Structures are given as structure tokens and as C-alpha cells.
Amino acid sequence: MADTPNASGEPGELYLDAAATESVSPAVIEAMTPFLTEAYANPASVHQPGKTAARALDAARASFAAALGARPDDVIFTSGGTESDNLAIKGIAMARMRKLGLRPVCGFAEADGEQPANCRPRIIISAIEHPAVAQSAAWLHEWFGFEVVRIPVDAQAHLDLDALERELDGEASERTTMVSTMLANNEVGTVEPVEELVRIAHAHGVPIHVDAVQAAGQIPIRFRDWDVDALSVSGHKFGTPKGLGALLVRGRTPIEPVLSGGGQERGLRSGTQNVAGAVALAIGLNESNARMQAQYRELVASRDMLIDAVRRVAPRADLTGDPERRLPGHASFIFPGVTGEALLVDLDARGIAASSGSACAIGRHEIPATLLAMGLEPS
């Protein structure tokens, strides 16, 4: 929780929307500023200022990787979670399609317009993915004929592991390019059993991408220990400016670039590298991890106190997501008979900033797809 600015720029009373974005940490601003004002050279340049920038980039990459249980060469710096998810989904799926010998849009030119099932590439995602994942999968379907399989979730937003097993059994696994799933849901806070998901995917020889955008800085991330193939994070969720993120990719994982250009970031993300941004990511994540370790129990206690208080004031309110296996600072509710918009307007008038779903869907006046996937009826 933090102060929120009102329309005049003065602090309001209470900011309860950190799941959408955090404030930029003062330590992050202090650390990155010299690379905006003094050591601003292109890290690819051969002169001394360029070498200074390159050393700072390497140090930031190593620090950032360690904070995620990864190696420096796993890290591909990007512009945020959306780009990281796009690179993972499109890059891995296309590379795997070619590796498996599958043909894109094969059969679409035939008279019946249908694609033979035995050559159609597949991608498996969950029913509650962020639009950056879901729409990337839809793009693969629209342009290359991919079959998009959505794994259902239960009433607490946990993936149906048996359904995932069934979708990977038999010949279907030979056409499955990848699996992609959230680590923690941004709308209801449920944390998925990532190690079990990795075990299932790898048992069938299929790589798995994990969207950890909502989880990084809130719960420990152990990229290498989990044996994940690719993992996305976004800096503005843990105290950096917006527009910063990363995709972790194991060297064994087939992946193709989405952007063409100078071949920076292992040839997977062309564009002049943002040294100040890399420094911000390293400082922000390490600071968030330290705070998480020091204040985890306090944060959980505050969350549970809020949940209890809401239930006392509104006995009909339903907590969404898993009541136990959830992010430590996340609480979301359904209030029967009250629209989210009306509630938020009232809270805002009282100086309380909150959200009624993913910030990426604000203004659409639709029932959140996550709640529908959990089996909740529109009301």
C-alpha cells in the first residue's frame, strides 16, 4: 500500500492497486540516473564510454539473473511483459514448428479450406492467460493455422493437471510446440504448481513458458531449479519505470526472434540496449526480493486482515482465488448486486484506489475472462 496522487498531483489516502503497477523505488531512480545523464554511451561501442556502459550492462544482467535463480546468459532484456510474452509464444512456437517438421497453414489452399489434423501445429495455454499470451496464440492460429488448446481451471483458478496430461497424450504431443501458463494470476492471485506443470510438459518432450509477470518480486522465482524453458517478467510490477522487462530463455530452447535488426540480446531482441533500464531491473528486483523476505509474514497478515475486514462489512462478499495458495499481497472479491464500476467510483471518491480486474481490460465493461473460466455466472 502507498499514497496515490489525486487529480491535483497531491497524495491521496490509500493506493490498493499495486497489482496493476508499483511506484518507482527511490533506490532505482538513484541507481539508473547516472546512466541517463553521464554514462549514457551505447554499450556496443568500442570506445571507453561504450565499454563502461557494457560493463554496467553485464553487471546488471548478472545481478538480475541471480535474483531469479537464473544465469546471465538466460536473460533477454525487453520492453516489458507484453513483449516478453510475445517473444516467448511466437518465437518458441515458430521455432518448434520447424523443428517438428510441421507445415504452417498446410491444407488451407485446398477446396474444403480445412487443415489436415496430422500436420497442424498446436499450442497449449490456460483458460486464464493474460491477453499478451492469449492474443499471441490467436495470432499463430490466424496466420499459421495453429490449433490453440485452452486448459480449463477450477473454481479457485488452478489449472486442471489431468486435462493437461490428456492433451499431451498420444500423437498430439508430437504436434504440440509448447505449453504456456501463468505462475500467478493477476486478477485473483492464485499461484499455480509450476514444478508439476513443468514435469508434465517435459515428460512429453514439450517446452514450457511461464508468465511470471505478476509473481516476480512477490514470491521466490527459481528459474533453473524449476527447469522452466522460458519465463517472462515486467519491471513496473517491482518498482522500476514502465517499459522494462525480460524474458529468460534456456540455451536449449528453440526460439526465433520477433524483431529484426542488429542482433543484440543473443540475436533474439534487436535494438540498442537500455543500460539504465537493465540497472533499474536489477536494483528493483533485488530490493523487492529483500523486502519480501523481511516482510512476508507481515504482508500476509495485512492481506488477511483486509480480507476479514471486508467480510465483516460485506458478509455476502466472496473471496476469489485460492484462499491459501495465493500471492501474499493480493485480495480480490465479488460483491453480489454491485457493479465493479460503481464500487470503484465510490472508493475513488473516498481516496481509495483499486481495480475491478486486469488493468489491460479496464473500460471494456466485460465480465473478466478469468472469472468466467472459474465457472462464475455473470450477475
Where are these regions (language model features)?
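Pyridoxal 5′-phosphate
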Residues: 1-379
